[in-house]
Amino acid sequence: MLFFIDTANIDEIKEAYELGVLAGVTTNPSLVAKEADVSFHDRLREITEVVSGSVSAEVISLNAEEMIEEGKELAKIAPNITVKIPMTSEGLKAVKALSDLNIKTNVTLIFSANQALLAARAGATYVSPFLGRLDDIGHNGLELISEIRQIFDIHDIDTQIIAASIRHAQHVTEAALRGAHIGTMPLKVIHQLAKHPLTDKGIEQFLADWNK
């Protein structure tokens, strides 16, 4: 499973990149709104200068024609821009049109296997099921990952699964076990993955023994 960071903060992206594990970035309007010091397009340019992998940039339009035009403009920013489209009927039309233009798409706000299958058949490069938000309403977000992966494997679908709305390290482990191709997460979760109390204890013991 590859690691993406879910943020529009350039300092966080650089910090994750320096760890040597970052394969891409996902952003959304809420994350971009926190970055008041720079325009959306300028921030995307900054990100693509740091990260050579996929950088998802979300449209804010709700009808297909406007999504398509917005997606075309976003794709001009850099060759590694992936246009993020919400999972709606209008969104599916936009995904089909952009896919026909060889523009990569990431269909977001996926909450069912049927939605993921529709998005894949429309030509989505990625689908993003939201784990944490499903957990919040008492549903099993991780089981959804399993369902989508099984369907994609049975039908030989190349669309990649991005496990999104990751809240903690266990989400990452379980998503990887269930076949998600990618996990996108906040910087704090990436740091959580690197930590274990026994690792810290072992380092302390090694240093104590060395200094005796």
Swiss-Prot record:
Entry keyword annotation includes Cytoplasm: yes
GO CC annotation terms, alphabetical: cytoplasm
Metabolic or biological pathway: Carbohydrate degradation; pentose phosphate pathway; D-glyceraldehyde 3-phosphate and beta-D-fructose 6-phosphate from D-ribose 5-phosphate and D-xylulose 5-phosphate (non-oxidative stage): step 2/3
Major location category of this protein: cytoplasm
An MF annotation (GO) of this entry: aldehyde-lyase activity
GO biological process: carbohydrate metabolic process; pentose-phosphate shunt
Principal EC category: transferase
Localization in the cell: Cytoplasm
Domain of life: Bacteria
Alphabetized UniProt keyword annotations: Cytoplasm, Pentose shunt, Schiff base, Transferase
Enzyme nomenclature, EC number: 2.2.1.2
Database matches in Pfam families: TAL_FSA
Catalytic-site annotation from UniProt: K84
InterPro entries, per the entry: Aldolase_TIM, TAL/FSA, Transaldolase_3B, Transaldolase_3B/F6P_aldolase, Transaldolase_AS, TSA/FSA_arc/bac
HAMAP family tied to this protein: Transaldolase_3b (MF_00494)
Function, as annotated: Transaldolase is important for the balance of metabolites in the pentose-phosphate pathway.
Family assignment from sequence similarity: Belongs to the transaldolase family. Type 3B subfamily.
Protein name: Probable transaldolase
